Amino acid sequence: PSSSQALSVPSLSSEKKTASPTCVKTPSFRRCGKTGKYGRAEAKKTHHRHHTLMSTTCRCWSSSIVLYEHLDARVTDDGKTSRRRRCSLGRYALWIYNIYSS
């Protein structure tokens, strides 16, 4: 594999969660939000009794590695906002890559 495909990710165990935001810095993640070969963002808004949660999941891939970036924004009734950015590593997903790269 070429070095340009290399991503700084933890181990390749399936659905490994990591607190480290390394995958957010990869070129794939910069393109997140644009539908296509590099990523797709899905936004979800859920209303709870005392807060609204805006959750955006970004999916990006390179070669057979799929990366997920989760951005949660929580707004409470009194206007307080908290944001949380999570990063997780998906399973090998060559079929996804093949579909979108063709």
Curated annotation (Swiss-Prot):
Segments of skewed composition (Low complexity): 1-13
Start and end residues of each stretch annotated as Disordered: 1-24
Name of the protein this chain belongs to: Uncharacterized protein UL65
UniProt organism field: Human cytomegalovirus (strain AD169)
Lineage: Viruses, Duplodnaviria, Heunggongvirae, Peploviricota, Herviviricetes
Gene: UL65
